[in-house]
């Protein structure tokens, strides 16, 4: 993996990072790296995320999924970090893009349509919740379990559970003697893609989880006390410096359909980790080349508050374009889709500094297990670095907890400080049939 920061320098873009300040930034990286390494060595909460590879045993995961290894598809019941890592990996690497479906929302229509479209006898259940009490996850699991029972499928023979040492989900797993894997200690869910939390569906679908871990290890080995020597830290340092310069939106734009969910995973990682104390880049999601025809207009000509992060594989499978039968399409003769998307990538990246707007480029070798594992670990490390540079509590999410507490209180009919805010919030409804 390599990172190109040239289009984010002040000589190319505004906002941008002055080349003369890179050495000062590098000194900050060295200090932050030392603090990160101290946290890793002590196994401190959150910093233990970067030690996850050492604690993840692929053989244990293979053993747990063995009873469902014949499944043709997997349904993951989880939310946030309990689902997005697995979704990103399987979308990037599974032979059948529809073989992994995710229930990470409680929209009843979506849940119903998803279950109606599956052959449950051929589908494994992967349920993930650290606490075992996550409302959305447990509600969806109960619905899924009933669907299996209604179709005469023994759900206890088609399930793998990943959860903590206590809680209702752990009790259920113990009661039915279900295959169970632990959620790693000291690791927030959004940093757990390269653990059982993210690796169960790939393992069931025959994806090379050892390769994913090896790729993550490569990114770990590349961490160094200098942005000039570490692609992950180069990305994190530049993202931090660009936010300081005014780029408060980070639009992630992969040029590979199979990396579309990577943008979703990155959005949670970046927003939940760094959105603290009135700061943090807002992650946006785009897809190349599709969004050249929509969002690119904003990125080149809208507010100067954005950096676009381009992600692409250097090598990719190809499809030849048949010779056209119209002279206006003759420029496509002898070309292929890979050449076309690469040309669009180069043109779009160049279009941003041409409009005096910043861009960062992340290039992986190819869409294989090693490269995807390397990308995920590198972005996690970059996020940890940004948190250190910005001096925020990277591994907590207090603003998220407010909504969780309020939801539970509403469901239980309890009166709490949160429900009082809900009851008293100002409303001005337009379109009401009764007079305001």
Curated annotation (Swiss-Prot):
InterPro entries: G6P_Isomerase, Phosphoglucose_isomerase_CS, SIS_dom_sf, SIS_PGI_1, SIS_PGI_2. It catalyses: alpha-D-glucose 6-phosphate = beta-D-fructose 6-phosphate. It comes from the Archaea. CDD domains: SIS_PGI_1, SIS_PGI_2. Pathway: Carbohydrate biosynthesis; gluconeogenesis; Carbohydrate degradation; glycolysis; D-glyceraldehyde 3-phosphate and glycerone phosphate from D-glucose: step 2/4. Its EC number is 5.3.1.9. It holds the Pfam family PGI. It is found in: Cytoplasm. Keywords: Cytoplasm, Gluconeogenesis, Glycolysis, Isomerase. One of its GO terms (cellular component) is cytosol. GO terms for biological process: gluconeogenesis; glucose 6-phosphate metabolic process; glycolytic process. The keyword NAD does not apply. Transmembrane segments: none annotated. It is an enzyme of class 5 (isomerase). PROSITE patterns: P_GLUCOSE_ISOMERASE_1, P_GLUCOSE_ISOMERASE_3. The active site is at 272 (proton donor), 293, 404. The keyword Cytoplasm applies. GO terms for molecular function: carbohydrate derivative binding; glucose-6-phosphate isomerase activity; monosaccharide binding. Catalyzes the reversible isomerization of glucose-6-phosphate to fructose-6-phosphate. Belongs to the GPI family. This is Probable glucose-6-phosphate isomerase. The gene is pgi.
């Amino acid at each position: 993996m390599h990172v190109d920061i040239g289009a984010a320098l002040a000589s190319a873009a505004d906002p941008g990072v002055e080349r003369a300040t890179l050495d000062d930034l590098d000194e900050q990286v060295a200090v932050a790296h030392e603090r990160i390494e101290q946290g890793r060595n002590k196994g401190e909460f959150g910093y233990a995320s970067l030690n996850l590879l050492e604690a993840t045993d692929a053989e244990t995961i293979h053993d747990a999924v063995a009873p469902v290894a014949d499944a043709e598809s997997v349904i993951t019941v989880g939310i946030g970090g309990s689902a997005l890592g697995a979704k990103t990996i399987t979308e990037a690497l599974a032979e059948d893009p529809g073989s992994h479906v995710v229930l990470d929302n409680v929209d009843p229509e979506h849940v119903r349509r998803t279950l109606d479209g599956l052959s449950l006898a051929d589908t494994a259940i992967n349920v993930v919740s650290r606490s075992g009490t996550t409302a959305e996850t447990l509600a969806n699991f109960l619905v899924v379990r009933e669907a299996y029972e209604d179709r005469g499928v023994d759900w206890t023979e088609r399930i793998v559970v990943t959860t903590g040492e206590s809680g209702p989900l752990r009790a259920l797993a113990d009661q039915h003697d279900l295959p169970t894997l632990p959620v790693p200690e000291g690791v927030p869910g959004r940093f757990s893609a390269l653990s059982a939390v993210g690796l169960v569906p790939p393992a069931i679908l025959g994806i090379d989880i050892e390769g994913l871990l090896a790729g993550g290890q490569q990114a770990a080995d590349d961490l160094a006390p200098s942005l000039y020597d570490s692609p992950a830290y180069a990305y994190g340092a530049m993202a931090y410096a660009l936010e300081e310069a005014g780029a408060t939106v980070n639009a992630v734009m992969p040029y590979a359909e199979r990396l579309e969910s990577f943008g979703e995973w990155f959005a949670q990682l970046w927003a939940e980790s760094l959105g603290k104390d009135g700061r943090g880049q807002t992650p946006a999601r785009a897809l190349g080349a599709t969004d050249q025809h929509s969002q690119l207009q904003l990125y080149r000509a809208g507010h100067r508050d954005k950096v676009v992060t381009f992600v692409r594989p250097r090598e990719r499978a190809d499809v030849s374009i048949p010779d056209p039968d119209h002279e206006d399409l003759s420029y496509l003769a002898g070309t292929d889709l890979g050449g076309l998307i690469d040309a669009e990538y180069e043109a779009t990246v160049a279009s941003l500094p041409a409009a005096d707007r910043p861009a960062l480029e992340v290039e992986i070798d190819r869409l294989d297990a090693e490269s995807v594992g390397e990308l995920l670990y590198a972005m996690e490390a970059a996020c940890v670095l940004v948190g250190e540079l910005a001096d925020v509590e990277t591994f907590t999410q207090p603003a998220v907890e407010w909504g969780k507490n309020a939801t539970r209180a509403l469901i239980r009919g309890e009166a709490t400080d949160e429900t009082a805010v809900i009851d008293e919030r100002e409303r001005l409804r337009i379109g009401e049939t009764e007079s305001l």
